[in-house]
């Protein structure tokens, strides 16, 4: 359970579940929680790991410290009241301090910092958490094998599967072929044009619209054309989102913003995101661009990943749309 201070809303008290063990058999307790907070916030801690900060601390920016009250009680301090903190703490990814210490003791390195970095590298290949599955084998970019954690704290939720094998397949057609050939039992984000074939073969498609908008992160460095609000508005007006929905076989919802209209955070925006090429062209000409003098931009895009569903087709579609509004985008595909 958890509670926030009656007087000080930056103080959070968490009561930990008794009897929970990490996969290596060590206890999940207050010391472990404090240790895991330190790994991303305390640069002086031996086990501080800068490589984890981006995927942990950046997602809970208000977290400032952790303090042990007793064996199963922890007090967290945030920089300000933050209703999302309990949810965002799932991004901390609790690791076993004892398992890491064993990796540290066995690691080679000229300095403690070198040994710490080596220990985290070894930990990543042989991790120890507290979930219903344990890591059995890990081959980077090839496969991850998980086995059931028979000592999971909740017997009612102990997995019925003995083993799960996860195989990275960046290309949607390769994933689909693996499913249809029986190589795998489940895939994420198949090619939209093969969904009828998949369903005809007796497979079930599970889909659901979710509030997950995948934006382009624009450069606001000095001299960037994106600093001009007219250019940003033009780009938004130039993307045919209904056309993208068709491209994806209907497997998307057309967004009006980061949150949908009617959401408590919607506010009263003055700019209406819609598809209006003529209005976009007018804004671009006001900003000094034209068909004869297009704006040049470069976009780094991912070749894979479930976040943007179909990153290559989607990120090919956007530059095609923008071209009609005097924006020429060169794509740099990153693995």
Question: Where does each model-flagged region fall?
Answer:
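Surface-exposed binding/hinge segments that line
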Residues: 15, 34, 53-110
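Aromatic- and charge-enriched surface segment that lines or borders ligand/interaction sites
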Residues: 2-47, 75-77, 178, 225-227
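Short, well-ordered beta-strand elements
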Residues: 11-14, 33-36, 74-76, 131-134, ...
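Ligand-binding "clamshell"
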Residues: 195-207
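Gly/Pro-rich hinge or "lid" segments in bacterial periplasmic/extracellular proteins
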Residues: 92-159, 163, 171, 278, ...
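Periplasmic binding protein-like
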Residues: 25, 186-189, 201, 320-335
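Append "and occasionally in soluble cytosolic enzymes with long acidic Gly/Pro-rich linkers
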Residues: 145-150, 199, 227-325, 330
């Amino acid at each position: 359970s958890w509670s926030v201070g009656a007087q000080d809303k930056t103080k959070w008290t968490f009561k930990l579940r008794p009897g929970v063990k990490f996969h290596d058999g060590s206890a999940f307790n207050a010391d472990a929680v404090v240790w895991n907070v330190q790994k991303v916030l305390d640069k002086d801690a031996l086990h501080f790991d800068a490589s984890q900060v981006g995927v942990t601390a950046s997602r809970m920016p208000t977290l400032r410290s952790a303090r042990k009250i007793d064996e199963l009680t922890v007090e967290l301090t945030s920089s300000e009241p933050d209703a999302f903190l309990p949810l965002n703490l799932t991004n901390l990814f609790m690791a076993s301090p004892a398992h890491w210490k064993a990796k540290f003791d066995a690691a080679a390195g000229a300095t403690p910092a070198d040994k710490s970095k080596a220990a985290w590298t070894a930990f990543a290949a042989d991790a120890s958490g507290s979930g219903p599955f344990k890591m059995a084998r890990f081959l980077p970019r090839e496969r991850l094998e998980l086995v059931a954690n028979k000592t999971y704290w909740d017997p009612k939720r102990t997995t019925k599967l003995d083993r799960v094998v996860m195989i990275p397949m960046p290309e949607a057609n390769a994933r689909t072929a693996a499913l249809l050939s029986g190589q795998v039992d489940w895939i994420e984000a198949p090619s939209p044009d093969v969904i009828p074939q998949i369903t005809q073969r007796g497979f079930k498609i599970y889909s659901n619209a979710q509030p997950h908008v995948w934006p382009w992160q624009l450069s606001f460095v000095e001299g960037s054309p994106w600093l001009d609000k007219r250019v940003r508005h033009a780009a938004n007006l130039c993307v045919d989102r209904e056309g993208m929905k068709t491209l994806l076989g209907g497997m998307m919802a057309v967004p009006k913003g980061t949150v949908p209209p009617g959401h408590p955070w919607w506010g009263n925006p003055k700019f209406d995101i819609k598809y209006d090429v003529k209005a976009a062209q007018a804004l671009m000409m006001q900003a000094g661009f034209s068909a004869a003098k297009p704006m040049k931009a470069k976009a780094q895009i991912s070749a894979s990943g479930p976040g943007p569903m179909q990153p290559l087709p989607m990120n090919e579609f956007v530059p095609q749309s923008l071209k009609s509004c005097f924006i020429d985008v060169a794509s740099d595909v990153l693995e």
